Amino acid sequence: MPKLEIYKNLFLDKIGKNFTNLEISELLEPFKAEFDGFDESSGKIKIEFNDTNRPDLWSYLGLARQIKTYFFGEMPYYDFFSKKGDFKKFYGEILVDGKMSQIRPFIFGFLAKGLIINDKMLETLIQFQEKLCQNYGQKRRRIAMGMYNSNFIKFPISYIASSPNHKFVPLGMDYELSLLEINEKHPKGLEYSHIIKNFDKFPLLLDDNNNVVSYPPIINSNNIGSLKVGDTDLFVEVTGIDFEATLLALSIAACDFYDMGFEILPVKTVFREPFNLDFKELVCPYYFQEEVEFNVENINRLLGSNLTLERICLSLKKMGVNSYSKDFKNYIVPPFYRNDFLHEVDVIEDVMIGEGLSSFNPELPKAFAVGRLSPLEEFSRNVRNLMVGMGFQEMIYNYMGSKKDFIDRMNINDQNFLKVSNPMTENYEYIRASIIPNLLKSESVSSNFPYPHKIFEIGKVALRNLDTTEGTSTFTNLAFLMSGKEISFNEINSIVATLFYYLNIEINLIESKTTFYINGRGADIVIEGFNIGGFGEISPYVLNNFGIFIPCSVFEVNINKLMSRS
């Protein structure tokens, strides 16, 4: 979970009131944050958050903004945001190469002017950038942010798919390296190059003088990409693979810079062919969030309350959320810096926090029952212990993912997969029907760790099943992956034999026709005439799709079917 260290004096100055450490601790409670101590020598407060839904709070500026809104009714407003059909005047352009659509497609930015950066401000900005990129940005994979002295940049900026041999001086060095050499030699390249190393070309930011601004998401240029105390005019950009996540990160940054005292000047991003987007250009910061409908009866039913619409709207306003009614329906309008309203229940949570947890009377459960583990869970735990005993490391994955990862890279069709009809992002468009793609994706970013690799997961999968009322079936599967230069079919067959020996289950093997195995090196597992899974060596074609260059063998079985025949 995110942890912050913020200067107490800056924090209190931004709130506009003085508080003791105990009072600060109480101020943080509604926002799932804990006061973790005060260092008198540095003057810093330590704060730890208990969830990751509100990246806008991960700076003293964002926290102060929310505290002022919640406790003192000061609703922030930012007039530099463009909206659909209402683009603001822009002061620079970013031109996006069409080839970037398949690499790291999104980049948005703004200019911040009019304030001289001191040492505390610089430290604050660097910490904010790091928290946003590491946590919300999933260690720069999802989004990454760069900050530059704009006086050294000539617009327009070009965001191109560059040759790996392109050279520039990276930040922290005094000699040129090619992009490929940065990946292999620079500390940041070694840490983050796995994000883009599987592409033939790499992202590069160039200004109109053809000077390198940045190699996102790896490292800035040493000549342009270094902020210093005394700088006044900044260019801030965010690149990413997720449209809304990239825009939100930029919006949060713009609001923080504005609250710090900067003037925010919009920048236009122009997407060139063959981008398949609903728009060809966007002036940012841009308000993209959608309104969410809520129902008063649903709120009162879930909270056990009797709140009026007026009271609900006041509670939402304490959270920085505006609301309105139209045609007998009620809607919330998310703030510029938030995008965590995915469903009506998220609105209800904000109402609950706005009301204050102490305003709800605790109730004892109306029913009492003695709990115990289900037979499936007991069996799964036994299997889990066996896997750990054989030297495997357990993984935990999301059940949802993209068509590219679950289907295209696996070289299979989508007939068994469940597709979400209204996905928020293509990264969560399908529900998995197999755990193997998750294991391969982990392997694709683990090449820096010593071999062999042995990982597994016991988790849910969902398949299309027209014989059921719902049209789907959900199962618990066990899957594991082994990788290494010496890993072969015989090696994994030995592990499979050991597993079923200790489970006291007899199995039969038949040659598998599964398309992601090497021909002749895959087997289906049959028990009492029923196919419950299989194992084999992954084909080089599929390995290449995931950017894996070491042999891998995988195994997957349906634990529900396995248990019923044990």
Swiss-Prot record:
The keyword Flavoprotein does not apply. Keywords: Aminoacyl-tRNA synthetase, ATP-binding, Cytoplasm, Ligase, Magnesium, Metal-binding, Nucleotide-binding, Protein biosynthesis. It is found in: Cytoplasm. The keyword Electron transport does not apply. GO terms for molecular function: ATP binding; magnesium ion binding; phenylalanine-tRNA ligase activity; RNA binding. Its cofactor is Mg(2+). One of its GO terms (biological process) is phenylalanyl-tRNA aminoacylation. Its main location: cytoplasm. It catalyses: tRNA(Phe) + L-phenylalanine + ATP = L-phenylalanyl-tRNA(Phe) + AMP + diphosphate + H(+). It holds the Pfam family tRNA_synthFbeta. It comes from the Bacteria. Its EC number is 6.1.1.20. One of its GO terms (cellular component) is phenylalanine-tRNA ligase complex. Tetramer of two alpha and two beta subunits. PANTHER family: PHENYLALANINE--TRNA LIGASE BETA SUBUNIT, PHENYLALANYL-TRNA SYNTHETASE BETA CHAIN AND LEUCINE-RICH REPEAT-CONTAINING PROTEIN 47. Belongs to the phenylalanyl-tRNA synthetase beta subunit family. Type 2 subfamily. HAMAP family: Phe_tRNA_synth_beta2. This is Phenylalanine--tRNA ligase beta subunit. It comes from Borreliella burgdorferi (strain ZS7).
